[in-house]
Amino acid sequence: LLEAHIEAFQNGNEHAALGDEIAELARRHAPHTQQTTSATYEVLVDPERARSGAWYEFFPRSARDDDQHATLDDAAERLPRIKEMGFDIVYLPPVHPIGETNRKGKDNAPTAGPNDPGSPWAIGGVLEDGSKGGHKSVHPRLGGIEAFDRFVDRAHELGLDVALDIAFQCSPDHPYVEEHPEWFYHRPDGSLRYAENPPKKYQDVHPINFETDEWPALWRELKSVFEHWIDHGVTTFRVDNPHTKPFAFWQWCLRELRTDTPELIVLSEAFTRPKTMHHLAKIGFNNSYTYFTWRNTPEELREYGESLFHTDAVEYFRPNFWPNTPDILHDELVHGGRAAHKSRFVLAATL
């Protein structure tokens, strides 16, 4: 057999050296004196919508045309239109009860008016029965958990996924504050520290101390927040400021969650140094916010695109391009009119 293949190759049949028979012959008689073996490694493949999903964000309490507070049932009526526009994932900012203590007003005003709902990211407030609810509760005025389940069911009927915001911080009215004060930072006088991002101050929010002496119990509880919503049909999440929490927590938490929920998709909202954004991708975040919003000229877009798609980052960092967010509206959109909005939408959808 070998001589026949040699003769065919010498007569100009180049394929003879590449045939299945000769390959099997070489494999069978190859020397094995230097052969080594290694462990079999598992390869995790991202869900399809982590690779190509289009996200649509809206506040469910604004889903009515009049001035009334909408419910999640009202919001569900908008889902067919979102599907028709071509989106795959509907992202809801926090739907939890909102704290009343130190509630903020419009434009981060230090006091709220009688009709101001407060910031949805000030998580933790009073439920209809007078008890306090937190990250595992739905705001009563949105319809409670029953309305949330109906919203998710309707989205799934249309082929849409629902994404929830995970913001690990608490209003002064959150049950964690009363039940686990050791999970928070304390001032010398014993009071709890509020969140700050100078020059901004967020008196309506207490940051969580991930390095508390009671960190094992804290970490397990925070992981259970994901598990709670997974049980309600949500496997896609947007994480608020993950770079301000320990990397070790995310690596452990996301690995544990994917043991039972491999279809998990987690978007990192981390506007920080590129190296930090890339590290979050390496430890388990499928997608990441980017600086697309601030790249507007052809030169800026070209340079930024090359840094994302023509470097080794393409192997592990999957960028999301958002034309705007609830708290970021670039001057190009403020003053550019409808044409600017359309062009940024097209760029975000096609780059």
Predicted regions and their residues:
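An acidic-aromatic substrate-binding cleft motif
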Residues: 2-89, 127-128
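Short amphipathic alpha-helices and their capping/turn segments at secondary-structure boundaries
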Residues: 44-45, 76-90, 152-156, 307-312, ...
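Aromatic- and acidic-residue-enriched carbohydrate-binding clefts of CAZyme catalytic domains
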Residues: 52-57, 62-70, 98-151, 178-216
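Hydrophobic faces of well-ordered beta-strands that scaffold small-molecule active sites
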Residues: 54-56, 90-92, 162-164, 237, ...
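Active-site beta-loop-alpha junctions enriched in small/polar residues
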Residues: 61, 95-97, 167-171, 242-244, ...
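Substrate-binding cleft of carbohydrate-active enzyme catalytic domains
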Residues: 79-96, 127-194, 214-239
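Active-site-proximal helices and loops of the catalytic beta/alpha 8
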Residues: 240-319, 336
